[in-house]
Amino acid sequence: MNEETNEPAREEGAAPSSGSQTTPQQASVAAGLCQQIYGELNKVFFGQDQVVSQVLASLLAGGHVLLEGKPGLGKTHLVLALANTFGGNFGRIQFTPDLMPTDVTGFTLFDMKSQTFQMRHGPVFTNLLLADEINRAPAKTQAALLEVMQEQQVTIDGQSLKLEPPFMTLATQNPIEQEGTYPLPEAQLDRFVMKVIIDYPDQASEEEVVGQVTQKASAKGLNAHAVQQVCQPNDILAAQKECAEISAVPEVVRYAVNICRATRDSQGISLGAGTRGAISLIQIGKAYALMSGRSFVTPDDIKSASLPVLRHRVQLAPELAISGQNIDDAVAGIVNSVEAPRV
């Protein structure tokens, strides 16, 4: 307690309090909810703790995720299980070269019987949307989805329809099969708050997956419906609001901006992160803080967020790419070169 002002003492690292900021008590409750969701997902998605944390942080931040991983690593399973934890609707689109924008958003159809136009909603009208192999559809179809992601609404024949929140797109890419694909342009990649890499699990986790799947003769895979629903969609919306109101002091904001500016000035980088990259760093930093039960962002939150937030926003110069330089190593080196503030 501050004796001169008769106000509660401020937490170290937190900004001065205001009515619109998340309180430590609210952060603690939200962190408990996150732990429940995290625990349920870990029951059916083994050995991928970091992936689960990153996807959950993106949901709290109200962002969309680009998932990259080889086939058979459980991307669909993860998204369906996440939807089940809060009773949300799940939708899936398999992107193919012949997929049309109306296959994504929906269309109007004239009903001969009633002599009226009927609205047919597309699969984007859901809470969690899995856009499988998004880079296999042509640019026009990709753009239709990315517009929905940005605007949170669909326009069909001049009629604008709002999506029911929460809405999150998780788009997948296969890093191996690139033949016949349409790479996402940089401006569209920038719409994803994170690029999450799903790798093979460790041996113990892989043995557990194989053991569970082969326990029953009729089993075709892990059961994403085995997770328990621990909250409602409105609880996710409340957590997103509290996440947005987590405190980020000017020094932490400056740190995020400095990291992004450093990517633009670094030798060997042909394209650095833009302002949206710094915004995403703060948004994910707030999510990490909330998941930890804190009402303020620390420099460590920003540093932890930097790799998944920036890896798809930064491009190596051709000579480094040809030599086999890894983009993750380049980003990590840049982040480590930027001095973190002491707050």
Regions found by a protein language model. Give the residues of each.
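C-terminal engagement/docking regions of AAA+ P-loop ATPases
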Residues: 2-3, 13-23, 28, 263-343
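Pre-Walker A (pre-P-loop) alpha-helix and adjacent loop at the N terminus of AAA/AAA+ ATPase modules
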Residues: 27-70
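Conserved alpha-helical scaffold flanking the Walker A/P-loop in AAA+ ATPase domains
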Residues: 54-57, 110-130
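Walker A/P-loop
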Residues: 59-96
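Conserved beta-strand position immediately N-terminal to the Walker
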Residues: 65, 129, 167
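Walker B catalytic acidic pair
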Residues: 69, 132-133, 144
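P-loop (Walker A) phosphate-binding loop of NTP-binding proteins
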Residues: 70, 104, 172
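Canonical AAA+ ATPase core
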Residues: 111-116, 137, 141, 149-246, ...
